[in-house]
């Protein structure tokens, strides 16, 4: 006779997942202050919108949770994805990067480099990576954020 392994209730699993201590990336004191409903200091109004949407939808997340990734030539580095989210149904961690200055060519180059590193580490958009983006003329669309969260995190 087989024994069915116990599966933690979603609420307990999320509670334990959220309780993991970590040190995120520091934000310089002279930077503008943006705070989420949970009281986290984030880097932009758009990140407030994403964080508060995740919270409202009951999706557990960590802001700028450190992630060690391999670089070329046997090197590695610690990255701080904007959000590390937990899909409670699958128990998978999904990264969410928001690219908020896509009309700045230097920013775009750095974003492309980051995406290349993610892909080298097996983290692909639509699988373990959600990408949102905006420009000055095409700001963040809240409905799109909700749809992305629903599609990948529910």
Task: List where the protein language model places each region.
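Acidic-and-aromatic substrate-binding clefts and catalytic sites of carbohydrate-active enzymes
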Residues: 68-78, 104-105, 135-140
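Short, well-structured alpha-helical interface segments that form or flank functional binding sites
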Residues: 45-49, 78, 113
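Basic, glycine-rich
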Residues: 119-154
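Short, charged/polar micro-motifs that form catalytic or ligand-binding hotspots
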Residues: 36-44, 104, 108, 135
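Active-site metal-binding core of divalent-cation-utilizing nuclease and nuclease-like domains
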Residues: 40-42, 55, 60-90
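Short beta-strand-loop-alpha-helix junction that forms the active-site gateway
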Residues: 80-113
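Solvent-exposed, charged helical/coil patches
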Residues: 1-62
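C-terminal structured domain segments
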Residues: 102, 106-125, 136
């Amino acid at each position: 006779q087989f024994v069915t392994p116990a599966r933690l209730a979603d609420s307990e699993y999320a509670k334990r997942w959220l309780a993991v201590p970590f040190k995120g990336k520091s934000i310089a004191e002279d930077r503008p202050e943006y705070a989420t409903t949970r009281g986290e200091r984030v880097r932009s109004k758009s990140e407030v919108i994403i964080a508060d949407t995740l919270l409202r939808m009951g999706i557990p997340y960590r802001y700028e949770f450190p992630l060690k990734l391999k670089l070329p030539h046997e090197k590695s580095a610690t990255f701080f994805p904007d959000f590390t989210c937990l899909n409670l149904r699958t128990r998978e961690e999904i990264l969410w990067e928001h690219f908020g200055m896509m009309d700045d060519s230097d920013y775009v180059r750095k974003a492309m480099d980051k995406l290349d590193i993610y892909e080298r580490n097996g983290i692909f958009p639509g699988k373990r990576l959600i990408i949102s983006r905006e420009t000055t003329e095409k700001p963040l669309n809240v409905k799109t954020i909700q749809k992305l969260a629903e599609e990948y995190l529910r």
